[in-house]
Amino acid sequence: MEGSVVVSEKKRISSERRKEKSRDAARCRRSNESEVFYELSHELPLPHNVSSHLDKASIMRLDHQLPAVEKVADAGDLDGETELDKQLNCFYLKALEGFVLVLTEEGDMIYLSENVNKCMGLTQFELTGHSVFDFTHPCDHEELREMLTFRNGPAKKRKRTNHREKFLPSYEMYINQSWKNREYKVSHMEGPSLYRTHACIYDNANNQNHCGYKKPPMTCMVVICEPIPHPSNIEFPLDSKTFLSRHSLDMKFSYCDERVTELVGYEPDELLGRSVYEYYHALDSDHLTKPNYNMFTKGQVTTGQYRMLAKKGGYVWVETQATVIYNSKNSQPQCIVCVNYVLSEVVEKDLILSLGQTASVLIPVESQEIKMPEIFTELNEENNSECLFDKLKQEPESLTVLAPDAGDEIIPLDFSSGDSDKPYEDVPLYNDVMLHSTSNKLESTPITPLPAPEMPKPLRSNVDPALNREVVIKMESNPRTTCASIHHSTAIQARQPFRYQFQSEPSTEPNTPEYCFDVDSEMASEFKLDLVEKLFAIDTEAKAPFYYPGNDLDLEMLAPYIPMDDDFQLRTFDQLSSLECDSSIPQTLGSMTTLFHQSLSPSTSDFKPEDAMSDLKTIIQSPVHMMKESTSAPVSPYNGNRSRTSSPVRPAKAVVDKTEKSRPGTPNLPVPLNKRCTILDEELNPKMICFTQCTAEKRKMESDGPLFQAIGIGTLFQTNVDPGPNSSLQWKRVKGSDSERLSSAEQRTILLLSTDMASQLLGQSFDGTVLPQLTGYDCEVNAPVHGTRNLLQGEELLRALDQAN
């Protein structure tokens, strides 16, 4: 028992010794490792306060990249560095807006400058030794690999290949080490010469190993990475060689800084609405395509150096930092803000590279008002032979200023006589508000010559065929005073406008548009506002003889226009076909046909004007609505003469028939002339023939009569004839019956238009009473207000509605 206890005690002691020995060995290894890393950290070209705080992983990464950095450093000419260069080395990083980055062919970052912390938020030692692909956006990896790939060229071009230039666009690097929440910042990679990257092959003389073999060359890429600032973070004012611009999404200027004028020569207003591609040098257009593409994909870009065309020739070297501004509401691109750095003066000023640089396009035209005093200048005695036309021919732009406007006075000037020259210094042509002058001096002042503003001598031109010896000037004086003072030209010449030779008819009003412009008569009538006022008023004064030739009277043009919204199936004059006339009506109708259609009926060959006037008086005194009615009822209410939308019968197509035939099954109702007039007299009211001449208010007829009194088509007059017993029945049959038609296929209505002469004739015939001036819309829509005893009642109304439908 005791022996077993002794054995177990020995085992325990031995195990403790082994553990202690292992701890001592581990402690010794750690101490040795620490000593090794301490020595390695001191081997690094870093300050003691920096190297003493490095961890083992950082020391290993830095020591691993140190030989590569030494190779890059040995490739440079360090022996030629002066004392001044050594003093300025500390200021280079302060002046540099970015950081220096050295990449190997595999993408390892073997060196970064100390100021990388200001740009990326990561220290120099946290990034050194890592791969650049760990800190860039995945979308930029392929582009970076393409830049890092070195391709050997032919032997004769090997020297050029050793310094291969490649344009480097922007790339993005995240600014913290959190892999779950990365934030990227756009940086631009640029090389030491013209902002292009140089992939250099460093081949030292002592590049042989211990065995005598030559080491492979060290290939690396040295770039300068500059972060692109956001426009909101730019410090203002900008540099004197910098101007700001804003563009739309299609790269058209929407704003430009005024500093562009002194740098490039363009005015800001000249660039607005123009594309920025118009000002790129043709050789740089392809290089700028990719940066503009990256601008929309990454949000920011730096174009690198390119040539921008100057205004008057040549170009300047420019570098642009472009930023896409997004809408805060929908995150859509809104505009592009560019900060343009002009890097040089205008190069090759005499070289024209674009049509926009030509003087004929870009030189602004001087104002025409400035040239006006140069035209009206004094003619010296030795220059009298010089013609005014030659002066105006040298400056054709001034002729456009001399063209008159609507309403201007046209005053021809006589250049042959100068005896009656008078100074015009005291005569005010215009006052402060460009109104007619009220000076009395114009009444006694001739307006024929127009002198220079400061000289009393007028213009003279003896040989001036192109201007027809007239000069059009603009004057806003009293027309009566001006016309009275023109004593060198006739009244007709004074009122003729300045027109071409093919002008045939002069205008009669000096203030109308056709006085200054050769316009069509229909277009000119639109400008005559006084005629519009006359349209809504009746003038009892006769302006022209009451004469309407048959060939010029177009009934279709006289028909009222009815919109589609008001296109109801209303009764019109041609549907009132149930009335029948006796044998005396065709005779009267024949006389009216003879009066208005002289060339159509063969019986009018012996017609005379005296008979026509006598027949006209007889017809006006006889209140008869004469018409020839059709018995053939069309199927559709909108076809034929039944429809109110159908065109009236032309006079040339009408043939007067003196016989009337009734449709089979329709009884003939002969109505004497005196009873038919009684019906019309009964329907009329004294209020019917009273009207107002108000042009704004719509005139309505207060009557209970039919549509005969509506539009002045067909005349209804009052006579003292006793009404017949069948007048009410006959009138109802006129309004409601479609079956009682006459057999004629055409209808003729006597038209007495509401013109001035018609008003005068009616006033003379009926003791001052006149008919109301109404439109077709009033006739067919307005219903009688009172006198309902003559309206359809009961079964007759239902029968009329059935026939209308």
Curated annotation (Swiss-Prot):
Posttranslational mods: In normoxia, is hydroxylated on Pro-404 and Pro-560. The hydroxylated prolines promote interaction with VHL, initiating rapid ubiquitination and subsequent proteasomal degradation. Under hypoxia, proline hydroxylation is impaired and ubiquitination is attenuated, resulting in stabilization. In normoxia, is hydroxylated on Asn-782, thus abrogating interaction with CREBBP and EP300 and preventing transcriptional activation.
4-hydroxyproline modification, residue list: P404, P560
Residue ranges, annotated region (Disordered): 1-26, 628-669
Main localisation: cytoplasm
Gene3D superfamilies with a match to the protein in the record: PAS domain (3.30.450.20)
Gene Ontology molecular function: DNA-binding transcription factor activity; DNA-binding transcription factor activity, RNA polymerase II-specific; protein dimerization activity; RNA polymerase II transcription regulatory region sequence-specific DNA binding; transcription coactivator binding
Keyword Nucleus: yes
Regulation: Induced by reactive oxygen species (ROS).
Positions with biased composition (Polar residues): 629-648
bHLH domain sequence ranges: 17-70
One GO term of the biological process aspect: intracellular glucose homeostasis
Subcellular location(s) of the protein: Cytoplasm; Nucleus; Nucleus speckle
Residue spans of biased composition, Basic and acidic residues class: 8-26
Domain spans labelled PAS: 85-157, 229-300
Single GO cellular component term: nuclear speck
Record-annotated PAC domain positions: 303-346
Entries under SUPFAM superfamilies matching the protein: PYP-like sensor domain (PAS domain)
(3S)-3-hydroxyasparagine sites (modified residues): N782
Pfam families named among the record's database cross-references: bHLH_HIF1A, HIF-1, HIF-1a_CTAD, PAS_11, PAS_9
Free-text domain note: Contains two independent C-terminal transactivation domains, NTAD and CTAD, which function synergistically. Their transcriptional activity is repressed by an intervening inhibitory domain (ID).
NCBIfam families documented for this protein: sensory_box (TIGR00229)
Subunit structure: Efficient DNA binding requires heterodimerization of an alpha and a beta/ARNT subunit.
Name the UniProt record assigns to this protein: Hypoxia-inducible factor 1-alpha
Native source organism of the sequence: Xenopus laevis (African clawed frog)
Taxonomic classification: Eukaryota, Metazoa, Chordata, Craniata, Vertebrata
